[in-house]
Design a protein with these regions (language model features):
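Subtilisin-like serine protease catalytic core
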Residues: 23, 40, 165, 175-273, ...
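Hydrolase catalytic cores
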Residues: 238, 261-265, 290, 394-458
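Inhibitory N-terminal propeptides of secreted protease zymogens
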Residues: 23-143
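Protease zymogen maturation seam
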Residues: 111-187, 200-204, 304-305
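Residue-level detector of functionally pivotal "anchor" positions at catalytic/ligand-binding pockets or at interdomain
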Residues: 469-484, 561-591, 607
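Substrate-binding/access-modulating region of protease and related hydrolase catalytic domains
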Residues: 178, 185, 244-247, 260-361, ...
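Catalytic-core environment of secreted peptidases
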Residues: 207-212, 217, 303, 367-416, ...
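C-terminal outer-membrane/trafficking sorting elements
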Residues: 19-21, 500-547, 551-561, 583-591, ...
Length: 670
């Protein structure tokens, strides 16, 4: 990853000398996956159940890219003397190899043997061999300075005490998600980076380690499990998501689970790193990951493979290995979040986004300060095919991180903006797993600060995660209504917590506006799906169309109040529920009324017998508090009614015969 950040403050990069030998690493691409021992009919043999569940949830069909590379092909390469198989990509059907004897004669011999295999499509040099772990001249990964960051002041009673990371969460209203229980639980994030130095001892990850949130690690460069001794860049990016030091530092999704994969070779800049990136993404998919956070990017390669550098025309989302792999990851249902790059400074001859941020299914993230001012280094769009890039922006200027030396410091780069956004996007998706990855990306664009006027610096702008949750809730929620015996029952389904509430409003025939007729409190400590029902008395309502709308209040705090209408329904009242006393044949009297007791009687006089006489009592809000069924013959009958459980106040007593309203009387309980 070249120049992914050009601004680092005072901490000197780790460095050793690099020794480059003759070209020794090659990419072998196969023609097909013939004679494969695996079949799409038995996917559990090569994909985890969690990976399969994702495909089922979003209706994603398996295809040939899911099949492992034919083992016989790989074994044939491995059997060649001096050949070491490095990483295998099933999505791209290709293998990287190392030739340990780099004499010209041996290189030629190996190449000839490989070319003779009928299943080989091509063989190309992809990197030189490397000894050491330093950076080549000109290559920089952002590393935070050693200066402690000042703590922001938290004026709200949030679930987390964020300490110094408060402002980079609040710029997105991310604390709102955390406060309603969306903190990353049940979600799995795969991080692709250049190393996670000291992640095993950094205190900010104590809870992640103790709770088993780090599910696995792998180094695709050194082909080993250990990622603790490599470059600190990944550790710092990891802290932006997973850090958890109450009162000092909290990441954007501290309760998520993680895979930490090293795919970046910090000491070089060769195309093999794009191949490694794809291999890392594949492993996240196979393991059942939900999100990929990648603070890596590519466009220029070093000698002697500089001819393989990407022209800007390659930044179209469909050309580079990394972009193809990123879009395949998205096709498998994962949310891919990538740093836009840091070549935006006017002095940089490139100036544009880097791959795989150019992927059309990738959420590319630019960098701003906590005040929303873009960093002068953030790479500009659009992509070469005209896509708005970056898609959104997050805090990448003076981002607060937990560094590899157990300190809290700050640094600049889209590499830090990326995990901040990835973590919050993960928390949002946690609440709406009914929606797929692309719906989450679309929503984040729609709630950006420049949603209607995207530009080439921050794309659709800085997403508001509270607004995103409201929009997704509106799309998710449903409502229905039904009428029986002059009463509407409204049922709705939405997502909430106990701190939220609903207001039900009605517009009756002849009315020009809506009137609030009832409330319903939310339930539970975690944001989740719930179903509610309220009844509305239609006494004295004319026949016609009645409209109801449901307003969900998401944030009841005065300073941060947020509410929106989640659904509107209409019902048709076919017969009027208006009653009059002018009926010489029917008479209804409540005795005594007012009543000081816990009972009263209904004196009913009708000329005909009524076998299905229904009595319903409603309070002033329209809620039914009593309902009973009786029968009577012609003439007068006295029906006693107990109201022992009712509070003092005014009620409406309605009498129905054969489903038709006979009368409604007002009752006052003293």
């Amino acid at each position: 990853m070249k120049h992914l950040i050009q601004l680092f403050l005072s901490l000197t990069l780790i460095g050793l000398t690099v020794t480059l030998n003759a070209q020794s690493r090659y990419l072998i691409k196969f023609k097909h996956k013939g004679q494969n021992a695996f079949t799409l009919a038995n996917p559990s043999a090569f994909l985890s159940q969690r990976s399969l569940d994702r495909r089922i949830r979003y209706g994603i069909a398996l295809d040939s890219t899911d099949l492992p590379v034919t083992a016989r092909y790989v074994d044939s390469l491995r059997a060649i003397p001096t050949v070491v198989v490095l990483n295998v990509s099933k999505w791209l059907n290709q293998v990287s190899i190392l030739i340990t004897n780099t004499t010209p004669a041996n290189i030629t011999s190996v190449q000839n043997k490989i070319a003779g295999f009928p299943f080989v499509q091509s063989s190309s040099a992809i990197a030189q061999r490397i000894a050491g772990s330093s950076l080549p001249a000109g290559k920089q990964l952002e590393v935070a300075d050693g200066t402690a960051s000042q703590r922001a002041t938290d004026l709200q009673a949030d679930f987390f005490n964020y300490g110094s990371s408060l402002n980079q969460i609040k710029i997105h209203n991310g604390e709102f998600l955390h406060n309603i229980g969306l903190r990353g639980q049940t979600m799995v994030i795969g991080m692709l980076d250049g190393g996670f130095q000291n992640y095993l001892t950094v205190k900010a990850f104590d809870s992640a380690r103790l709770n088993g949130q780090i599910l696995g690690t792998h180094d695709f460069v050194a082909n080993e499990a250990n990622v603790n001794n490599d470059h600190p860049h990944g550790e710092q990016c990891f802290s932006v998501i997973a850090g958890n030091l109450p009162g000092q530092y909290i990441g954007s999704a501290p309760k998520a689970s993680f895979y930490l994969f090293r795919t970046e070779e910090a000491a070089t800049e060769y195309p093999i790193e794009e191949h490694n990136w794809v291999c890392g993404a594949e492993r996240v998919d196979s393991a059942g990951g939900d999100v990929i956070s990648s603070s890596l990017g590519y466009y220029e390669f070093q000698a002697p493979l500089q001819a393989l550098s990407h022209p800007f025309s390659d930044m179209n989302g469909n050309t580079t290995m990394a972009a193809i792999g990123a879009d395949l990851a998205a096709k498998k249902g994962m949310l891919v979040v990538n740093a836009a790059g840091n070549q935006g400074d006017p002095s940089d001859s490139w100036g544009r986004i880097v791959t795989p941020a150019d992927g059309d299914s990738v959420l590319a993230v630019g960098a701003v300060s906590t005040s929303g001012v873009p960093g002068n280094f953030t790479s500009r769009g659009p992509s070469s095919d005209g896509q708005v890039k970056p898609d959104v922006a997050s805090v990448g200027v003076a981002t607060v991180i937990a560094n590899q030396n157990n300190g809290i410091s700050s640094g600049n780069g889209t590499s830090y903006a990326c995990p901040n956004m990835a973590g919050l996007a993960t928390c949002l998706w946690q609440g709406f797993q009914e929606f797929n990855n692309m719906k989450i990306i679309t929503t984040l664009r729609q709630v950006g600060s420049r949603a209607t006027t995207p530009n080439d610096t921050i794309g659709y702008g800085i997403p508001d995660l509270k607004k995103a949750l409201i929009n997704l809730t509106k799309e998710y929620s449903t409502a229905s209504g039904s009428i029986a015996t002059c009463k509407t029952t409204i049922t709705w389904n939405s997502k909430d917590v106990s701190a939220m509430k609903y207001e039900l409003e009605r517009k009756a025939p002849g009315e020009t506006g809506f009137t609030k007729i009832g409330e319903q409190a939310g339930k539970g400590n975690a944001f989740a799906n719930r179903t509610y029902a309220l009844s509305d008395s239609l006494i004295n309502i004319q026949a016609g169309t009645i409209s109801y709308r449901i307003r969900q209040i998401f944030d009841t705090t005065t300073a941060t109040f947020a509410a929106d209408y989640i659904d509107t329904i209409t019902v048709n009242l076919t017969a009027s529920c208006v009653t009059t006393a002018a009926n010489p044949q029917n008479e209804v009297v409540l005795v005594p009324n007012p009543t000081p007791r816990d009972a009263f009687a209904i004196k009913i006089t009708t000329t005909n017998a009524i076998q299905n006489l229904q009595i319903r009592i409603a309070d002033m809000g329209g809620k039914t508090v009593h309902q009973s069924t009786h029968s009577k013959g012609p003439g007068t009958v006295l029906i006693p009614i107990s109201i022992a459980g009712l509070a003092k106040g005014k009620y409406f007593v309605s009498i129905y015969g054969k489903g038709q309203l006979i009368s409604t009387q007002e009752l006052l309980k003293l």
